[in-house]
């Protein structure tokens, strides 16, 4: 009898793990619908205006640092996401992707639309987003993983 209870417990754990793994890595079906903070080497500086192409047409990553005409982006620090509706698929917006510059200052890139409209975003089930320890609000998430596409969001 004890063998059956242990066997049942083991099977339940395996099934729960398999279900959790499937939802943990639930990425969007269309790769065009996701965006992530660009790599430092993909960011161009033109007289203090920092830009990087986005995956989706009609949007780009943009940031400005006054007096940083010759500085280079050297390191990604973190991305900050503000939840506006956590009940619906963790909707909100990226407040910024924060980078270190060669002169010791910081750069914050935002996702800007060519037509000026704001995009509804979601962190979905991307595992790199966690509640920020730098802010006193569960509505502010951060991602500081360094690998490509770690800090992804879904554009809706």
Predicted regions and their residues:
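Bacterial N-terminal signal peptides
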Residues: 6-16
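N-terminal secretory signal peptides that target proteins for export/translocation
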Residues: 1-3
């Amino acid at each position: 009898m004890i063998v059956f209870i242990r066997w049942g417990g083991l099977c339940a754990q395996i099934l729960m793990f398999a279900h959790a793994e499937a939802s943990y890595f639930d990425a969007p079906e269309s790769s065009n619908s996701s965006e992530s903070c660009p790599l430092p080497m993909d960011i161009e500086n033109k007289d203090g205006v920092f830009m990087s192409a986005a995956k989706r047409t009609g949007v780009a990553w943009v940031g400005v640092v006054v007096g940083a005409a010759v500085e280079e982006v050297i390191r990604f620090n973190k991305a900050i996401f503000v939840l506006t509706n956590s009940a619906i698929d963790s909707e909100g917006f990226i407040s910024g992707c924060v980078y270190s510059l060669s002169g010791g200052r910081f750069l914050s890139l935002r996702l800007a639309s060519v037509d000026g409209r704001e995009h509804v975003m979601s962190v979905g089930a991307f595992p790199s987003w966690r509640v920020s320890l730098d802010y006193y609000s569960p509505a502010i998430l951060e991602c500081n993983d360094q690998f490509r596409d770690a800090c992804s969001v879904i554009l809706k």
